[in-house]
Amino acid sequence: MLNIILGGAPGSGKGTQSDLIVEKYGLQHLSTGDALRAEIKSGSELGKEIGELIAGGNLVPDHKMIHLIERYLDNLPADCKGVIFDGFPRTVAQAEALELLLERRHMKAVLLDMFVEEDEVIKRLLNRGKTSGRADDNYETIKKRLQVYQAETKPVCTYYLHRHNYFAINGNNSMEDTFCQIDNILRLIQK
């Protein structure tokens, strides 16, 4: 089973590349961002809490995210070829918890880290904010999200690097060139 953690700063192109990977490899796509936005839209108490955290540029607490992931893994179809984790794990504690969840299921994952220059990330997110209407795509919140990413999520890369499950991807390139890098790595992993 091919399990991929698609990492990178907000706006690095994780969602776009996830779609391309799903199309080519037939994997299940778990976008935690989509799952969290759906919870917010539901109007539940949890959704309200999550909405306030996200609007402020903060991460959702680990225990809530881990519960969401465990529920997702428990409901995978029997013929599942693998999962793309888009937006998870975002902390080392989440990475450790994910590793345990996967080990219990005799699975493992690799991290594909999409690096994009900060100026390019800001430009992409501001442009996305104009068309998406997402409250978290404004300059102040973007800067805070990038600070949170550097402080809390970037260490996840080191965690996977030490486990030899880390691959760096240059996300500054075109969508096609970036996918070509990813595709080459995935073909090597599957051999």
Describe the residue ranges of each PLM region.
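Glycine-rich phosphate-binding loop of ATP-dependent small-molecule kinases
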Residues: 1-191
